[in-house]
Amino acid sequence: MQELDLIIVGAGPVGLYAAFYAGMRGLSVAIIESAQVPGGQPQNLYPEKLIYDIAGLPAVTGADLTKNLLEQLAQISHRLFLGESVQKIEKEEGIFSVTTDKSTRRAKGVLLTTGAGLLKPRKLGIDSEETLANKGKISYFITSLKEFEGKNVAVFGGGDSALDWSLMLEKVAKNVHLVHRRTAFRGHEITVDRVMNSNIQVHTPYTFSNLIENELELKKIKSEESLNFSIDKILVNYGFLTNQVTLAENLEVSRNGRVKADSMMQSNIEGLYVAGDASDYPGKMPLMSVGFGEAVHAINAMTKKLEFDHPLRGGHSSSIF
């Protein structure tokens, strides 16, 4: 069985960039991803949504970000295994065995970039929700904005996703109604300002009451007041429930189910590192840009701590390519 320098579990944005950086440092690397398509949430949940907080990219869609990361990754030697679910990670005599539902691979180091785990959307909580979702009346994320062209759309939620999608839907939908059960939104101030100064109809503090055919009824919180308007589609942005899977015995996790990391992004198991939304430490910020830095930090740390059978590369990227 071939022994690699590094196995990365998770092919989201942080995992893809981590693989590129590891290859740039001269590590032999493989990435294992349970989904059939790489790219994580940006690719699979919101490929057309614009992302604004990545350095050097004024705005990029989830699909284009994934495309760019894969093009970057293609510059180095690597192996990408899709559709394989990691079952367990074991360490014996300083070497990790990563077992999936299809095979077992060995490596000196492991980097977990599994994100928030398996995601299930939080739902409205109404009796007919599954039927309405199957009919396409209710959605939890958008894979194609064309589905909403010329439609009357109601967006439920008060965070960044609800705000961002409302702004994007405004460009294609006939009308956009943003419904939040509180008076204040939880998103970035600049995004809230953009929504308030747009043509989006904001309804706060309201919650879902009833839907008959295309007639949506909202109920005002702590009031008998109600509001009715015609609607074609509903987008629910109440966030996601996560199902983090502990892959290694004795791996320390925080209360929120994420892997505890030290200042070098190493877990309590020597040689097993973590980066991105899967990690937790004091002051942790769940941002993609932070995850990229965590991946670099973890790989640089393991190159100093672990023993490799070949010399590693250093220096700036401009001197390597």
Regions from the PLM with identified roles:
Residues L163-W165, A278-F321:
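A conserved FAD-binding loop/helix module that cradles the flavin
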Residues G23-N44, V176-G187:
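Glycine-rich FAD pyrophosphate-binding loop
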Residues Q36-V60, H188-V192, M196:
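Conserved N-terminal glycine-rich FAD pyrophosphate-binding loop of Rossmann-like flavoproteins
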Residues M1-V9, V37, L80-K151, K220-E224, ...:
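FAD-binding core/adjacent interface of flavoenzyme oxidoreductases
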